[in-house]
């Protein structure tokens, strides 16, 4: 989530997704601690009547706590049932992805705010280069994309809004055909020595049989700031990667910008 308004709106959508009869799964709305969780920010709050109209009353059908309808919820599952459960979990997640794309448009029509569904595309249509972000860093990144555009650099931004299930088809559609892209992760995947979202995106591109020169970035660990200077540095690295083939070594933004 980029800001507190998006958190509020997504939370409302999340209930409708989780309670849909074709999903029925727990859902997490994740956002940056302190940068958003402890920040005072003005938001527009829908009325209770508007929310009630958007969120139908939840009427459980599969599990009901009712002494007149006793049931046992399986405490131990054998292989056959577990396989069926996992299949249905996977199907429910894929349904959630489709539902988010649809609900985002419905929410936008009703409340005047929408966020692109599973991903948000910012100035990507004619971009040669794309920087991929997630969370609160996106605000400053959008500003720097605008600055790069003003300087004649055709840069766009792709913001990840959903991680599970991963919107691999949309990601590949946006990034395929670009001259280069970079992913700024606020995490580390030690097995790959890159960030987690970077590897998810590379897997999506591989599934689409599409290769685009790319750069993995890691920044902002432990709450360290990701500033305009860091994003400008990342954009320049992505553009420099254009003429090369293969992957770039992971760039630790906070260290490189400081000259460490």
Where are each of the predicted segments found?
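Peripheral docking tails and interdomain loops at the edges
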Residues: 185-260
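Flexible, glycine/charged-enriched surface loops at secondary-structure junctions
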Residues: 21-30, 113-122, 155-156, 211-216, ...
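Conformationally flexible catalytic loops at phosphate/diphosphate-handling active centers
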Residues: 26-120
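Redox- and metal-dependent alpha/beta enzyme cores, enriched for Fe-S-associated oxidoreductases
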Residues: 125-153, 166-173
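Conserved thiamine diphosphate
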Residues: 1-33, 210-224
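Short acidic, glycine/serine/threonine-rich loops at helix termini
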Residues: 9-13, 38-45, 144, 170, ...
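A general structural motif
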Residues: 99-116, 133-141, 160-168
């Amino acid at each position: 989530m980029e800001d507190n308004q998006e958190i509020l709106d997504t939370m409302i959508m999340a209930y409708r997704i989780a309670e849909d009869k074709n999903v029925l799964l727990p859902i997490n709305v994740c956002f940056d601690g302190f940068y958003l969780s402890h920040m005072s920010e003005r938001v527009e709050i829908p009325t209770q009547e508007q929310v009630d109209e958007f969120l139908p009353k939840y009427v459980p059908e599969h599990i009901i706590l009712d002494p007149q309808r006793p049931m046992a919820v399986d405490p131990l599952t054998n292989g056959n049932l577990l396989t069926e459960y996992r299949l249905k979990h996977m199907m429910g997640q894929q349904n959630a992805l489709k539902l988010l794309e649809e609900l985002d448009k419905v929410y936008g029509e009703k409340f005047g705010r929408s966020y692109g569904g599973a991903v948000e595309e910012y100035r990507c249509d004619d971009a040669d280069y794309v920087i991929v972000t997630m969370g609160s860093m996106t605000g400053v990144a959008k500003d720097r994309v605008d600055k790069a555009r003003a300087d004649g650099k055709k840069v766009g931004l792709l913001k990840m809004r959903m991680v599970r299930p991963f919107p691999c088809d949309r990601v590949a559609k946006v990034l395929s055909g670009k001259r280069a892209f970079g992913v700024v992760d606020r995490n580390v995947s030690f097995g790959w020595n890159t960030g987690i979202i970077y590897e998810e995106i590379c897997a999506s591109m591989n599934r689409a049989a599409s290769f685009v020169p790319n750069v993995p970035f890691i920044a902002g660990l432990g709450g360290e700031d990701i500033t305009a200077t860091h994003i400008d540095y990342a954009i320049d690295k992505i553009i420099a990667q254009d003429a090369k083939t293969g992957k770039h070594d992971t760039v630790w933004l906070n260290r490189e910008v400081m000259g460490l």
